[in-house]
């Protein structure tokens, strides 16, 4: 069984996954309050349901399947109960999804750019993360973080994001667990082969950080999370660099690689 790593607040899907909206990274530890400056909490009236990454003062990147109505974004957040003095909240001004995305295939081009209604200011807990200038190397140690599940099945509701280190794996190590994956989906495979560390429900849209660059976006994975030979699937940000830069530059008709 596979899991899109977001809580969709809709009808049956809401009933199926509702308990996972506030869960955290499986197999990780509480993030240091000073290590997730670019992490964005995406929330609505029901709470946090996705994450994103600040890539400059006006733009956030997240997963396309995190698109929803009436959401807001919180920057500089750590604890849900204790506010940081420099937390900032913004609304989306514009949202961009690849125009050539296959709407019936969630894994296809699972990336969304969000322009904020006003820029955020850099602060002690807010700073953008750079995009990659080259593809990541297999074997790289990468960092995951988010407000998603700390347990693969049972529900836990910690108040802070969790972080973990995982490895970037060769596609051949992913294919047996995900025969539905196609090359044109432009994804990365990352995790621990023997299992135990993984992103999970509620982590969708969050970052896969390798060499201090945003290399991946949490998209998809096995259920229960953290299974052996079922690592997480991440949108490969490097393959979308040209599209991202075109949109930011004002070419809103730009298309993504097929």
Curated annotation (Swiss-Prot):
The keyword Kinase does not apply. Residues 25-249 form the Peptidase S1 domain. Expressed by the venom gland. Pfam families: Trypsin. GO terms for cellular component: extracellular region; secretory granule. Residues 1-18 form the signal peptide. Gene3D superfamilies: Trypsin-like serine proteases. Residues 19-24 form a propeptide. Changing residue 60 to A: In albofibrase-2. PROSITE patterns: TRYPSIN_DOM, TRYPSIN_HIS, TRYPSIN_SER. The recombinant protein has fibrinogenolytic activity against the Aalpha chain (FGA) of fibrinogen. Activates plasminogen (PLG) (is 4-fold less active than urokinase). Has weak thrombin-like enzyme activity. Belongs to the peptidase S1 family. Snake venom subfamily. Does not show fibrinolytic activity against Bbeta (FGB) and gamma chains (FGG) of fibrinogen. Does not show activity on prothrombin (F2), factor V (F5) and factor X (F10). Does not induce platelet aggregation. This is Alpha-fibrinogenase albofibrase. The lineage of its organism: Eukaryota, Metazoa, Chordata, Craniata, Vertebrata.
């Amino acid at each position: 069984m596979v899991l899109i790593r977001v809580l969709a607040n809709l009808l049956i899907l809401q009933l199926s996954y509702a308990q996972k909206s506030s869960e955290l990274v499986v197999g990780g530890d509480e993030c240091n309050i000073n290590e997730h400056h670019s992490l964005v909490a995406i929330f609505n009236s029901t709470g946090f349901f996705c994450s994103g990454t600040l890539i400059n003062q006006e733009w956030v990147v997240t997963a396309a399947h995190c698109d929803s109505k009436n959401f807001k974004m919180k920057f500089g957040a750590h604890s849900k109960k204790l506010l940081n003095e420099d937390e900032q909240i913004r609304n989306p001004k514009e949202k961009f999804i690849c125009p050539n995305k296959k709407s019936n295939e969630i894994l296809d081009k699972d990336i969304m750019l969000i322009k904020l209604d006003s820029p955020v200011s850099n602060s002690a807990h807010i700073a953008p993360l750079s995009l990659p200038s080259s593809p990541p190397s297999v074997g790289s140690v990468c960092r995951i973080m988010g407000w998603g599940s700390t347990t693969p099945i049972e529900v836990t509701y910690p108040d802070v994001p969790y972080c973990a280190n995982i490895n970037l794996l060769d596609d051949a190590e992913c294919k047996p667990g995900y025969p539905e994956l196609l090359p044109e989906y432009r994804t990365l495979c990352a995790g621990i082969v023997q299992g135990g560390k993984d992103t999970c429900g509620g982590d969708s849209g969050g970052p896969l950080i390798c060499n201090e660059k945003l290399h991946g976006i949490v998209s998809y994975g096995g259920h229960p999370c953290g299974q052996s030979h079922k690592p997480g699937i991440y949108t490969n940000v490097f393959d979308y660099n040209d599209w991202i830069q075109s949109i930011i530059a004002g070419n809103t008709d730009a298309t993504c690689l097929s």
